[in-house]
């Protein structure tokens, strides 16, 4: 956890880079949040696309995600796009680690020695790299479903609450 925190601090404090890895999808959510802060409609296609281009995207794309899907990007909107993109990568990376650990605990509880191998394989598995590289929010519903399964397996009474909170996102 210390190494993860140190990596996060280094990523945030390093020099900004143009919109690139981790920002192609995330910039849509970030631009939508910016429009909301300005009191504008995040689904105004012209305004959203113009802002996305201004933020570094080569071309704008329409925002089709439902409003509640913007919640994970909400805390990042006050940061510069470069910092917000980096933190989004860190948040998605942390979600991947937690999801992997939960699935490993559910299906291989007697083989904890597999966890380092599973975590290392995340860096080589294309879907993991794609989610991190685009800045998608698709890990949030997976985290909700995984949390619900894990909570049910543990016999927690609030398993449905975990699912509800994260699936709404």
Question: Where are the regions a protein language model picked out?
Answer:
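Hydrophobic core segments of transmembrane alpha-helices in multi-pass, intramembrane catalytic enzymes
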Residues: 96, 137-146, 168
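Aromatic-anchored segments of alpha-helical transmembrane domains
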Residues: 5, 121-128
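Short acidic/glycine- and proline-prone juxtamembrane loop motifs at membrane-interface regions
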Residues: 130-138
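Transmembrane-helix signature of polytopic, membrane-embedded enzymes
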Residues: 103-124, 142, 159
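TM-lumen/periplasm interface segments of multi-pass membrane proteins
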Residues: 2-107
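Membrane-interface alpha helices of multi-pass inner-membrane proteins
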Residues: 158-169
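Membrane-interface transmembrane helices that cradle and orient dolichyl/undecaprenyl
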Residues: 138, 145-159
